[in-house]
Amino acid sequence: NKLLILSFALMQMTLFAQENKKVQKLDTILIKSTRIDLPFKENSRTINVVTSAAIKNSAATNVADLLQQVAGVDIRRRGTAGSQSDLYIRGGGFDQTLLLIDGIKMDDAQTGHHTMNAALPLEVIERIEIIKGPAARVFGQNAFTGAINIVTKKKLSNKVSINLEAGSFGQLNYSATVGKEYENTSIIAHAGSLNSDGYRTNSDYENNNYFLKGIFNKKNQPIEVLATFFDKKIGAENFYTTNPAWNEYEETQNSLLGVSTTFRTEKFKISPRIYWRRGQDIFLLKRDDPSFFRNLHITNKVGVEANVSYTSEMGITGFGIDISRFFISSDNLGNRNRTMANLFLEHRFTLWDNVDVTPGVAVTYFSDFKFNAFPGLDVGVQLTDNF
């Protein structure tokens, strides 16, 4: 009986200790993948967020490997170390899925096959927002089956990190990431290189990446400047053909330069942005004989956009305009250009404190296809505080 009483007393002490554990509240994530910024728990769209903690705890070494772990996202890869990959959401093709970096559209004038060439190194990513399902109403074309927004870090608090890896088949990876905080400025810089001789014939690669982000005038009107450059040289054995006599080879470049800021008042939020994106792709069917078959494509996109949200007693209204000019120079497609304009409008109504309705429309103009409209409606019901 004494043993039974002692065991019961220990069980009571254990239960008492569990009841006194502190509850840790997590920071609210404000979703930026929509025209209207909303806390994650209040958003009615099907959105997954890969947080910085999830990125840190993941075994993934690049964005392609990380996204492959998300249900509903299909990454089809060729080669290793993120050398080449195509992005699919819910069965849509790579031309139907849009990639954004800090809200900047990274669509390519030639093909969505180059979308993932713009993926950033994990060291500078704060989180990744994944919209599953039709998003053309929010982002226009190239987002018919979904969109992925990579949100970069704003500061690294005077940190320096260096990475060096070596392995079989001539593998050598190295990178450096630096964060510097000044009184009125934040700077993040990253440079890295992934190299290998390849585990089989013509599977070598050299992938170089550079990233620079600055936030200036932080105390008054913050201005963000973002610059990236990626250069890949890939032995593309059997990437596009199965003929063992052809040693395919590909070189790609992807660069981005963007400047943005945000103006805020009690009811208005205005976010203008200007950006330039460049892509280059060289493909050789025979690596040792460039004259046999060679494709060269150079694409440029220059754009300006502004997003506005207005909060009133009727709810939140989101309005956006995006005007861009595409250029392509190709020894196969020739020299072409196109002007595109997107106009977005949506309004979020809240009914009975637990029902939200968001109708909206996107109107897209192409200089060679004229106008197209993409209407849509989101409806959400909050059953409990957490569901």
Regions found by a protein language model. Give the residues of each.
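Repeated loop/turn-to-beta-strand initiation elements of outer-membrane beta-barrel proteins
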Residues: N158, N184-I188, N220-V225, K233, ...
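Non-catalytic regulatory/gating segments with a bias toward low-complexity or hydrophobic composition
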Residues: I55, L67, I128-E129, I148-I150
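N-terminal periplasmic "start-of-domain" segments of outer-membrane beta-barrel proteins
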Residues: T28-K56, D86
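Extracytoplasmic beta-strand/coil segments of soluble accessory domains associated
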Residues: A64, Q68-I104, D108, E126
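Short strand-turn segments of transmembrane beta-barrel domains in outer membranes
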Residues: A147, T152-K180, H190-G192, S196-S203
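Flexible loop and strand-edge segments within Gram-negative outer membrane beta-barrel domains
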Residues: S196-N207, F211, N220-K301
